[in-house]
């Protein structure tokens, strides 16, 4: 983990701090932090623990691994006792027997329970061991008045300990434990939400879910500005990095660190080292990831689907056609990819969760598979050419007006269905898309789209959207006198609550830049970046 990877996330830290204060005041609200790999979930916890200081709270951070119950219990007890003794001013050792001996002077009853638990483990018994382990936190509270904050990182791995119905057992403890706060973390969003909605869905002791997303465009740009202060780099290349990484903190960090270490090295060279060279950090990471999909016919089918999506064939019906199978025959493999959070689904479309993985699959992994001789020199030159072409295409695209790019996108719609913020939307096949001007409205320019049975009216708002804007746009839409309308305002700034409510009342969609980029992703088009209208003028060195 990179120390400087932590950036922003102040809202999430504030929630954690508030929940700690609430715990001391007698109100316990457990927390579940979920998000894709590499988005910085653990870094939020580490930052919180780093700045946390309260003698009345004992933090217990446990990274849950694929290990036996005995190993988990011993690590848990060691961390619990070590952090309990941390403020005692005595020299400490990471030795379980030492920690038990020293703690026995302060919490004798808890130590007796620990010894009994370890004895049970030595007999290779598992019944009730996990619940006894978690009850140690309440025992310490009874003896000292101190609260424990137990953090299970990748908590879904608790299933590998061999305890039957471990989450059901845990739920029973959660109901009665009032003095212990649990924070659980998971990179498997689909699986975690399943556990939370089923086994850990409780009236008392339930979990507040905090979803960690990649950085948005502005935060990504702010991160690069902060981390590349000593590097002279064109704004267009910064925006390309934001687009390429999808705002993933790990990728932003790795690329910015390499640019800082070697400011004279081009971005193409850096991406080549990371993604193409066999010793590259991301090459090895993605190679290990792809190895999960080898060894059986079903795994091979999942990998074939992943290749299709990375290559731009991301409609389910198109994948079925190319693989010569029915959608029903592919459903189990698609569901497996969805459940592992390798891909996401939006209506009739699929896309890779990790943008950089998708690029690597298309331009590195598949190229190596399809090469008859694998001429390393030729493959490297081809890779560099594709990276360079991708950068040039991005820069050229971002210079075009947003309205023009949206018109191009709308012409690609073919009556497929997508999902935007949990709402389904049919992408009508338009026979006509044209520019319009709203003369009596602050939303001066827009698009009018006609299909066989409906019209879409789209307006663009480049500064803050107001309730007045929405009211005027609603009046403009009425001029078209068509019953079946989709009214959409595309805005490039945050929409305040009042404006959003007004839009709901007028049945107007408000799409922010994330919504638009979501649709662009589904059609393999370059994303829109906030700073695209203000690119710097220094010479561009790729």
Language-model region placement:
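A short helix-turn-beta junction within AAA+ P-loop NTPase domains corresponding to the substrate/partner-engaging
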Residues: 196-214
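P-loop NTPase nucleotide-binding core
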Residues: 28-149, 158, 180
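A short, conserved structural fragment
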Residues: 338-348
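Short amphipathic alpha-helical interaction segments
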Residues: 323-340
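Mixed-charge (Asp/Glu-Lys/Arg
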Residues: 353, 360, 366-542
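Winged-helix-like regulatory helical subdomains adjacent to P-loop NTPase cores
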Residues: 253-327, 374-375, 379-382
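Sensor-1/coupling segment of RecA-like P-loop NTPase cores
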Residues: 34-35, 142-151, 157-162, 170-199
